[in-house]
Structure formats: structure tokens, C-alpha cells
Amino acid sequence: MENQPKLNSSKEVIAFLAERFPHCFSAEGEARPLKIGIFQDLVDRVAGEMNLSKTQLRSALRLYTSSWRYLYGVKPGATRVDLDGNPCGELDEQHVEHARKQLEEAKARVQAQRAEQQAKKREAAAAAGEKEDAPRRERKPRPTTPRRKEGAERKPRAQKPVEKAPKTVKAPREEQHTPVSDISALTVGQALKVKAGQNAMDATVLEITKDGVRVQLNSGMSLIVRAEHLVF
């Protein structure tokens, strides 16, 4: 037992479980819904194997069941399975709806992170384009023109067309936003905005939670946002 290798990450534990229980866990592709209470079954079956602790098993299960591929598999008509792949009853509607909401929130978080990263890239590109005044280049001496001989006829100068000065375009005024300082003062149905980088997206308050405020974007997507990302 002392010479057994130790699994250091939840991903390694999941890979071990997929190899040990291939009819229950999978390392890739759509995952099957797990039996309720499967944690205790795991403790009983793999106790002492690979130096696994209960904490490692619990963390690996949490990562596995919150992955997108697992949430995709939690759908109407799907059947839960035990460690040997035996059916353990169909999913109820409440669990299916909970998985759907988790998947929507995860996608919304990724979308918001991508929007914030794009905004930061645009800011960095704009900052890189603002160079300091370059040193003036030395002027080359103008070639000297021969003097006109006395009595020679002077040629009329060609008149340059008068250039109109370009009209100055006023920069659009930046919209001023007021940050939300106290989420307890918000009400369900209240309109506000969600900050994503330099942009602010319109949203409506759905629920006040201990983790933040659940809002719905105009696109119909709902997500939980912390107070520092909310403005009026």
C-alpha cells in the first residue's frame, strides 16, 4: 500500500474512476447521470486504493458533476447509474431544471469573461498606438534656384487651390454610470446594467442571493453578478 502512486489532482482522480468504473464514469464525451448517494459507494469500493482520501473523492465528484458534458447529460428521460452501470431510476424534473440553469450560468460566465478579455485587448492596442512625439527629422536644404536675369519675363505663379479646413467631429460623450453600493436596496424587476470591461449591458434583477445578484440580460441569458460589476 505504501508503494502505491498518489493521485494529485481531481482530473487524475476522475481518469482513475473512469478506468476503474467504465460503465459509470467517462473521461470524455457526454457523461451519464450518477446515482444519488454514489459518494458513499465510492468510499466503500475504493477505500485505500491509490491512497485516495474522502476529500479527494468529494472534490473529484464535484468537478465531474459540474462539468458541461455532465450537465448536458442531465436531461429528461435520462437514467441514473451506479458504479457498475446498473440503472437507478430516471431523473426528476427538478434535477433536470437545476442542471439546465447551472449550464446557462456557466456559459454566461464564460461569455462575460471573453467580453472582458476582448475589451482589455482593445484597450492595450489603443494604448500601444499612442506613441510619444517622434523627434523631428532634419530638413534637407532647399535647392537654390538661379536668379532671374534682368529683363527676362517673369512667369505667373500658379495659384494653389484653397483647402477647406476639415470640420472637427465632436467625440461622443461617455455615458456616466453610478455603481451599485448596496445590493439589498435592489428590487426584483429593477433595470440596471452589467459591466463587462468598458461596456455595460442592460439587465433586469431576477433575485438577490448571498453570492450576488441574479440578473437577466436582454438576450434572455441569466447569471449571478457581484455588486462591483453592477451599475445604474
UniProtKB/Swiss-Prot annotation:
Its main location: cytoplasm. InterPro entries: ProQ, ProQ/FinO, ProQ/FinO_sf, ProQ_C. GO terms for biological process: post-transcriptional regulation of gene expression. Pfam families: ProQ (PF04352), ProQ_C (PF17516). GO terms for cellular component: cytosol. Residues 117-136, 147-177 have a biased composition (Basic and acidic residues). Residues 137-146 have a biased composition (Basic residues). Residues 105-182 are annotated as: Disordered. Keywords: Chaperone, Cytoplasm, RNA-binding. GO terms for molecular function: RNA strand annealing activity; RNA strand-exchange activity. It is found in: Cytoplasm. HAMAP family: ProQ (MF_00749). Belongs to the ProQ family. RNA chaperone with significant RNA binding, RNA strand exchange and RNA duplexing activities. May regulate ProP activity through an RNA-based, post-transcriptional mechanism. This is RNA chaperone ProQ.
